[in-house]
Amino acid sequence: MRQTHSCTDSASISAKLNQIKAFYETLSPSSLDQISELYGPEARFKDPFQSVQGLPAIRAVFEHMFAIQPHSRFVVDGITQTAHPLTVPAQSCLRWTYWLVLRGKTVSIQGCTWLCLDQQGYIVDHRDYWDAAEELYEKLPALSWLMRWLRRKIAPG
């Protein structure tokens, strides 16, 4: 059930960001019901592979992630809050490491998430930034040779 509260001061924004951090670090198929406690009903989610809007679509992104990577997990390495905590929507950045298994090997992907929170502290915009070429494609045997070749062609000298 949604709780109505104000999230317009630095302390309440920090508390909400810590709640978001805890959610991502304990994310599992059984915790997906908590999405509605964190995201607004029309929230937008974008990463290098998709752009979706609304709680059902965001939940589907995570359901798919667990369907193809059942043992994946996030570790939030840091949180940066905007210099002006009263800015609406409040904007923050989470630096993270995503751990997954590719061809029997545990690998990590480094990235960050840009979050915008409304006055009630719900995420209204979630944008993931990470280098799919370096962090994923180069780790896939079928594409790694192509990515190395492209890197050599593009690099100066």
What positions do the PLM features span?
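A beta-strand edge to alpha-helix "cap/lid" segment located at domain peripheries
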Residues: 2-4, 67-73, 79-157
